[in-house]
């Protein structure tokens, strides 16, 4: 697809990104930077939603590796995403951008329960919608949650914000000769075992015809550049014959 034609976009952001240069928690300077990037994106007349991770506070899979039951560990990870979502909502609101948090785990005194119809209504009215608590179920990644929410809100595009400017055949940080892909098909991602998103997330997007863009959130202006159709991301979609 022509990415520049996308009008409803879901942005998946890892919790680790919120740490900035810190070893833990939320870096105020990165939060301010993220707000600026989001505001620049919605200035393009984009309807924007986010799915945010919680790895800067707690990773369920790490807790499980340390002997904690996986279900309980994943539930703790879901709660970490709620903290991040509320922090981002507050930062956006303080900067004059309306934002709503919707959670997969009901906590009515903290956030709205997830509802795809109300989420789409909020977005049409110019509000940023932040989805937290993953899918609400253990054993599912936030990548899968992002793909699921993208399907539910009928997004035109799913953007995954990462540390690098696209998808490579190996880690470009460790391998300076790593090859960057401009475009890929869902099938190529799966068969090449490229560590972009988990298989469930890729399959959901493929079955529902939602292109995926992978870009660097740490490059200022990259988000808006991608939304304008500039080659700042690797685009994953089915190729037209």
Swiss-Prot record:
Inhibited by UTP. GO terms for cellular component: cytoplasm. Pfam families: AA_kinase (PF00696). Pathway: Pyrimidine metabolism; CTP biosynthesis via de novo pathway; UDP from UMP (UMPK route): step 1/1. GO terms for biological process: 'de novo' CTP biosynthetic process; UDP biosynthetic process. It catalyses: UMP + ATP = UDP + ADP. Coiled coil: none annotated. Its main location: cytoplasm. PANTHER family: URIDYLATE KINASE, URIDYLATE KINASE PUMPKIN, CHLOROPLASTIC. Homohexamer. Catalyzes the reversible phosphorylation of UMP to UDP. This is Uridylate kinase. It comes from Magnetococcus marinus (strain ATCC BAA-1437 / JCM 17883 / MC-1). The gene is pyrH.
């Amino acid at each position: 697809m022509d990415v520049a034609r996308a009008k409803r976009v879901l942005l998946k952001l890892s919790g680790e990104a919120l740490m900035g240069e810190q070893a833990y928690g939320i870096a105020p300077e990165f939060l301010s930077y993220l707000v600026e990037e989001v505001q620049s994106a919605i200035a393009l007349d984009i309807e924007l939603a986010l799915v945010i991770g919680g790895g800067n506070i707690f990773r369920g899979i790490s807790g499980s590796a340390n002997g904690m039951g996986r279900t309980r560990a994943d539930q703790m990870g879901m709660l970490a995403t709620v903290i991040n979502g509320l922090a981002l909502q507050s930062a956006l609101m303080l900067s004059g951008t309306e934002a709503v948090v919707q959670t997969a785990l009901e906590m009515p005194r903290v956030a709205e329960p997830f509802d795809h119809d109300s989420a789409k209504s909020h977005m049409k009215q110019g509000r940023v919608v932040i989805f937290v608590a993953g899918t609400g179920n253990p054993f599912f990644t936030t990548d899968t949650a992002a793909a699921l929410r993208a399907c539910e809100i009928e997004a035109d595009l799913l953007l995954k914000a990462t540390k690098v400017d696209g998808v490579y055949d190996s880690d470009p940080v460790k391998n300076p000769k790593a090859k960057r892909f401009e475009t890929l098909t869902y099938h190529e991602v799966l068969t090449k075992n490229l560590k972009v998103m988990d298989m469930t997330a890729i399959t959901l997007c493929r079955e529902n015809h939602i292109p995926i863009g992978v870009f660097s959130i740490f490059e200022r202006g990259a988000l808006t550049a991608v939304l304008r159709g500039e080659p700042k991301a690797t685009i994953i979609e089915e190729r037209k014959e």
